[in-house]
Amino acid sequence: MVLLSAGNLSISQSVREILQIEELREIGENGQPGPPITIWNAKSMFDAARVLGSAVRHVYDRDAEALKHAGLDFNVSFIFGGQVRGEGMRLFLVYSAGNFIEATTETPYFQVGESKYGKPVLDRVLTPETPLDEAAKCALVSMDSTMKSNLSVGLPLDLVVYEANKLQTDRVIC
């Protein structure tokens, strides 16, 4: 699983820490609570995204009022992707409210943070059939375009290249 963030760094870091211990509890058919679902035991990426959304809401409940009094918005978004054994690759965009959407063949990628300058590069080149190495190059060109067009965007950049069904990655570019 890979987690990328944009927005308020302190919120992102808090969510990341809460995510380590966050649990979802569902009521089973017998009316009793089932076993907790965590980021570590989720049986699907959808369930893992639900746990992430719950962690975002947990931090919101804890910090939003104090941020508001300081004149700050609760501003965070995440790209969350990966693969759970037995399931295909999945990619989610998680919003500040903890709700999320999933990538589709019509929307095969997500961006967080400043996107208007680099997005046209991606829209013109990427398709679901784009080879992985070409897609990685395209992502780097998109990020470079954004950095050159907007002075508030800068290093560091992180890029993870993951091949479906490997259940590991050996290419992390920073």
Annotate each language-model stretch with its function:
Residues 1-174:
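N-terminal nucleophile
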